[in-house]
Amino acid sequence: MEWLGKYWWVLVLVFLLGVLLNVIKDLKRVDHKKFMDNRPELPPHRDFNDKWDDEDDWPKKK
């Protein structure tokens, strides 16, 4: 178990490499063209800044 104390970072790198390979493999399976054709409509953006930002910080144009 002494080697685990010295080389724990190798195990972490192997784990991260495995996660990265699985992510790449899963992303290759995604059909982006099919998703873009069937994507849901987004609701309109609602901005509530107009309710509290009454003061005008910009200089007035003459």
Swiss-Prot record:
UniProt entry tagged with the keyword Amino-acid biosynthesis: no
Alphabetized Pfam families for the sequence: UPF0370
Compositionally biased tracts (Acidic residues): 52-62
Keyword Calcium: no
Compartment list: Cell membrane
Biased composition (Basic and acidic residues): 36-51
InterPro entries: UPF0370
Protein's membrane topology: Single-pass membrane protein
Alphabetic keyword roster: Cell membrane, Membrane, Transmembrane, Transmembrane helix
Chain segments annotated as transmembrane: 4-24
One GO location term (cellular component): plasma membrane
Domain of life: Bacteria
Segments of this protein annotated with the region Disordered: 36-62
Family according to the record: Belongs to the UPF0370 family.
Protein name: UPF0370 protein ESA_00777
Native organism: Cronobacter sakazakii (strain ATCC BAA-894) (Enterobacter sakazakii)
Lineage of producing organism: Bacteria, Pseudomonadati, Pseudomonadota, Gammaproteobacteria, Enterobacterales
